[in-house]
Amino acid sequence: AKSTQEQYDYEPMKSNRWKKVEPVVKSYIGNTLHLLGQLTDASMTSLVLRRLAASVAFLKPFERLTKRVTRTTLMCFSSGEPRLRVSAIVLLRAIAATCPGPALERAVKGVYRAYASNAKFMNANSAENIAFMSACVVEMFGIDQNQSYGLAFAYIRQLATLLRNALAQKTKDAFKSVYCWQYINCLECFERILTAHASNREYSSKGSGEQTTKDGSTSVLRPLAYPVQQIALGAARVLPSARYAPLRIRLLKILNRLSRSMETFAPVAPLALELLNFSELYKAPMSTKAPSPDFTLALRVSKTELRSPAVQDVVVESAFEELGEHYFFCCFFVFYSKTYSHR
């Protein structure tokens, strides 16, 4: 049996018998697409997608069929069925890794847009699916970083434009376009992309100051770390309020993870200290029977919840935790830099 990479690298057009089997292959793919359009059972659809993934090398000569397969598979990926979503991303990744450049761009765009569409709401039921789709986006952006850079740059610029409008217009709609789950989830997704594919854990300095991979190639996505960091810093300043403590804590985590993985400084301390100094946290706590909100599933808390001792404890503990991690990294980075410079 051939390995997965051997299946991807296989070029059926180079076979002497290709002209004879080409109509059969084209008919097979077309009929499979028709079957996918008629199926309603998730298990059967998943099986068909898996068989298509095993035959993905035969899509290379047929650009129009590849577009149709990608479109249909993206619809399956966007569905709420977890098993179907797994089979769909396996096929999409195979298409992106096997077929010519335009196929990769379509697949990466489609997966990211499906994620962004599903990331609008966050609750206990959707959190796991959103996390899985985020991991899929990270995987897709790492297939070809040269092509992924342009797409990532465009999507990050969209986030920056929304932030700029919120800071300039100061309207309710502009504000809501930033302080919402879709915006925060997309920003967090790009932080994960950079951590996975441009981290200093994956790159080593060659003495010229340029970050290079183990095989000598230059990191392509790494320059995007700075705009992502600036967006996170700007988003935290849109509406400085203790009611949005869960959102700010989430942004602090993004900044700390990005700072640690890129080995760059981010001014986390002022944001954390400002959070600790909000006057609402110094008001006398009020006992309440209502359960404390889960900060991983909330972007803001109500005025009543903010007076709850449990909520105040979580805010203070989380702020100190992120502040401690920030200072620990700063001390480690200074020590490491001095040690490295004396070698």
Predicted features, each with a name:
Residues 34, 38, 54-58, 75, ...:
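Positions within ordered alpha-helical repeat solenoids
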Residues 160-343:
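Eukaryotic scaffolding regions of large macromolecular assemblies
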Residues 45-52, 87-88, 133, 186, ...:
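Conserved hydrophobic register position within alpha-solenoid helical repeats
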Residues 57-66, 96-108, 141-152, 195-206, ...:
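Flexible loop/turn segments at the boundaries of HEAT repeats in alpha-solenoid HEAT proteins
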Residues 3-67, 217-230:
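Alpha-solenoid helical repeat scaffolds
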Residues 1-34, 97, 105, 109-129, ...:
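Long, low-complexity, highly charged intrinsically disordered regions
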Residues 21-30, 45, 62-71, 85-88, ...:
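Core helices of alpha-solenoid repeat scaffolds
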Residues 16, 34-44, 60-61, 75-85, ...:
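Short coil/turn segments at helix-helix junctions and helix-capping linkers
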